[in-house]
């Protein structure tokens, strides 16, 4: 009898506990309300009971989100994520909450966390692609869309209509209509469009169609003729008049992307006449030819400084005439190469050899030079808008002088580019490291120069390459190492004018190892320049104003230049 009474009591106790648990555990009721999307009732049910499971946090968080209680929804879903860190539902829904509050950066982080849990989740990939698309980062949007076989593009349109030949523009786009647009197709198309050299600014956009597919819209600022208006043509041609030079330019000849660029400088110390013609080879944007001629008559006074006390190391008048031809090939989106040849003649007059100008540097006569260049993109992080690229050039030359000379110039480049903002180019950061090495005996005009000067691209921005109008005040040499860092802040953007301001830091060293005397041309020590610069764009023409300070000597430099 006692055993029977004990069994009856045990059964009664268990039934009571089950009844109480059924009354207190809201999971079943919450799930039912969730499936029926009865959000107010679900909130009322769960706000008064302890939620000890991730599922309850999920139901409650979504109900709060549907009622637009964003902050509480975020806290609840975060609690559920802590209970179930491997459940992808929580970061996806947290991304939705952040998205509704326009917190795109937070939404992207949550979706990337979800994709680390399940890289094939279609909803998360499409959601993340949509956010990047709304931010204007089409490259990253395609990266995630491509995982789910999207987007399908039906046609390519130019808005507004362009003057370039439609067939040429069509060949510049690597994509095919009625197919999925991929990241590689986008990047290859961008490389080809850039290679046409008639689009200083452009955008490739996607426009949704009613059937769920897309059209590619190409919006571009096109260079055509002397300019898009008389004012622009005048400014392009005479923008350098204060530097005693004019730069007539004619772009997109007959819609063929053939460009004719020229420069005429009448400065008595830096006379120069230059012309270049370039265009797609046989109408193929993957290939581009360039031919040109360059005539120079320059007075040089080689000295140790552009300001203050200075020692003259030598002086001369250089006359140089050259013609050149080259072919450039785009190989996909990341690689391109250039091969060319140059034939030139030089002679020197009014030479003051001083202690620096050796007979090898003053070699005269005809020269032939073979040039090769290779550029390759090493790394690309489109989410961070960060790229690292590299380049190498080789110039092998032979001079028919008495005696004859030959040389080889090698240069390498490593460049980093970062756009820290999700949109636009505000606070753009650039860093370039370049190095050069010379083998053999080079003539004077083949030496490298570290300094800011209109005919030189190896800038130390507190070392001006001219003094009293004559070149020769910047360090010269056969071997160099140069680092240029700068950042730009957008300060003004109007209809015809844009202004950027920012600091810079240049570090470099240059030396000449050919002889003891020629070593006086180099810097001997490391150079450190810092300062600020303003970059103006006026009717498509670039103007750069520079203030630089030489941290080694304390010299201040002010410089202005006009470019394309």
Give the positions of each predicted feature.
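Register position in tetratricopeptide repeats
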Residues: 35-36, 66-67, 100-101, 134
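Periplasmic polypeptide-binding modules associated with outer-membrane biogenesis and secretion
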Residues: 78-81, 96-100, 104-239, 246-250, ...
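C-terminal outer-membrane beta-barrel translocator/porin domains of Gram-negative envelope proteins
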Residues: 367-499, 503-504, 511-513, 558-562
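Helix-start (N-cap) detector for alpha-helical repeat units in TPR-like alpha-solenoids
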Residues: 54-55, 88-89, 122-123
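Gram-negative/organellar outer-membrane beta-barrel architecture
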Residues: 189-389, 452-468, 473-483, 542-564
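N-terminal leader/linker segments that initiate helical-solenoid repeat arrays
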Residues: 22-55, 59
